[in-house]
């Protein structure tokens, strides 16, 4: 009798564990799909995608890949462009953090805590700078920032900020996301802006075929224009 009671108690627990593992596997796979399918990756900037949306985009993308006139090999270029977005965003976040540390927290470059934070961010940036795809004639990202005092190029900014800004750039120099105005800045963020290069200078050599790929893929899945899925052509200078 006691053995039967023990068996009954074990069964619900085992079922819950199995069910949890199954849900975890499903969620893990859906997260991977969201990072793999280009259109799902592009839409994640506007908020979290529903599971059904990710599955629908995956089906549409696979259909487009298997269509006879899909331009083979271009998907790598599309994913490389998304990698560019990531590197640029990481660089922008690093600049804002340094601006916060030096203006709000009043840290100096000689502070141990400041140096440790910056060294950690730089180490992660170098790891992320490794090319994921074959070279596409793009300038190599340079994350080798050095701790140094502020130079005349950065009037009005603290010494720590000069460590993060490329030549001629200041905090908040570049709009993000590309093609859209920056959201209202936090009190510690500068609103200074600099002119962006002309469109011909902004576009990397492979953007022309990329635009054709976007239009072809979106036409196949029933969207007439790339902006229908919030997929904007990058309007920012190359990652420095």
UniProtKB/Swiss-Prot annotation:
Gene Ontology biological process terms in this record: central nervous system development; GABAergic neuron differentiation; GABAergic neuron differentiation in basal ganglia; gene expression; multicellular organism growth; negative regulation of transcription by RNA polymerase II; positive regulation of transcription by RNA polymerase II; post-embryonic development
Superkingdom: Eukaryota
InterPro entries reported in the protein's UniProt record: bHLH_dom, HES_HEY, HLH_DNA-bd_sf, Orange_dom
Subunit description: Self-associates. Interacts with HES5 and HEY2.
Keyword Nucleus attributed: yes
Keywords for this protein: Acetylation, Developmental protein, Differentiation, DNA-binding, Neurogenesis, Nucleus, Repressor, Transcription, Transcription regulation
bHLH domain mapped to chain residues: 10-65
Compartments (UniProt record): Nucleus
Taxonomic lineage from the root: Eukaryota, Metazoa, Chordata, Craniata, Vertebrata
Tissue expression: Expressed in heart and testis.
Name of encoding gene: Helt
Keyword Secreted attributed: no
Modified residues (N6-acetyllysine): 48
A GO cellular-component term linked to this record: nucleus
Source organism (scientific name): Mus musculus (Mouse)
Known role: Transcriptional repressor which binds preferentially to the canonical E box sequence 5'-CACGCG-3'. Required for the development of GABAergic neurons.
Name of the molecule in the record: Hairy and enhancer of split-related protein HELT
Reported consequences of knocking out the gene: Death between 2 and 5 weeks of age. The mesencephalic GABAergic progenitors in these animals fail to develop into neurons.
Principal location listed in the UniProt entry: nucleus
One term of GO molecular function: DNA-binding transcription factor activity
Family per similarity comment: Belongs to the HEY family.
PANTHER family assigned to the protein according to its UniProt record, in alphabetical order: BASIC HELIX-LOOP-HELIX TRANSCRIPTION FACTOR, HES-RELATED
């Amino acid at each position: 009798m006691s053995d039967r009671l023990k068996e009954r108690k074990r069964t619900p627990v085992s079922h819950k564990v199995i069910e949890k593992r199954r849900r975890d596997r499903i969620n893990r796979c859906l997260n991977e799909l969201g990072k793999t399918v280009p259109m799902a990756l592009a839409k994640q900037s506007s908020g979290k995608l529903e599971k059904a949306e990710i599955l629908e985009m995956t089906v549409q993308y696979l259909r487009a890949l298997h269509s006879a006139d899909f331009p083979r090999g271009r998907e790598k270029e599309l994913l490389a462009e998304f990698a560019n977005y990531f590197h640029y965003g990481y660089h922008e976040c690093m600049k804002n953090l340094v601006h916060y540390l030096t203006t709000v927290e009043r840290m100096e470059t000689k502070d141990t805590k400041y140096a440790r934070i910056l060294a950690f961010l730089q180490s992660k940036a170098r790891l992320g700078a490794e090319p994921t795809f074959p070279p596409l004639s793009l300038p190599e990202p340079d994350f080798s920032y050095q701790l140094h005092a502020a130079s005349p190029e950065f009037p009005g900014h603290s010494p720590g900020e000069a460590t993060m800004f490329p030549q001629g750039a200041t905090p908040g120099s570049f709009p993000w996301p590309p093609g859209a105005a920056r959201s209202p800045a936090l009190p510690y963020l500068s609103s200074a802006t600099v002119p962006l290069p002309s469109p011909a200078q902004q576009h990397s050599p492979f953007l022309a075929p990329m635009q054709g790929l976007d239009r072809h893929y979106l036409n196949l899945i029933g969207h007439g224009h790339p902006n229908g899925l919030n997929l904007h052509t990058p309007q920012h200078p190359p990652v420095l």
